[in-house]
Amino acid sequence: MKVNLKPLSVNQCWQGKRFKTPKYKKYEKEILLLLPNSYKVPPGELKIALKFGFSSKLSDWDNPIKPFQDILQKKYDFNDSRIFKAIVEKEIVKKGEEYIEFEITKI
């Protein structure tokens, strides 16, 4: 099925300036420390594969994509507009065993 309408960006969905919450700032700091410095993002158009391990069945599969992607962009100095394809998976895990897996490859 195809809908002939320009997609709305997250930025276009909200009015006014948005600020990072203290919880997001803490999350960003923790992720930046956990991500390996040696990871290299290839040049050109990219594909990202993400797998989120949630402990709640109610977690939406798409909610963590943009915050995590923005952190990857910051850590590895690339523009996420280069991502042309994404594969996203959700897995339910025990509380305390939550995780994020990712891989960025050239198309």
Regions found by a protein language model. Give the residues of each.
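Acidic, proline/glycine-enriched N-terminal capping motif
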Residues: 1-107
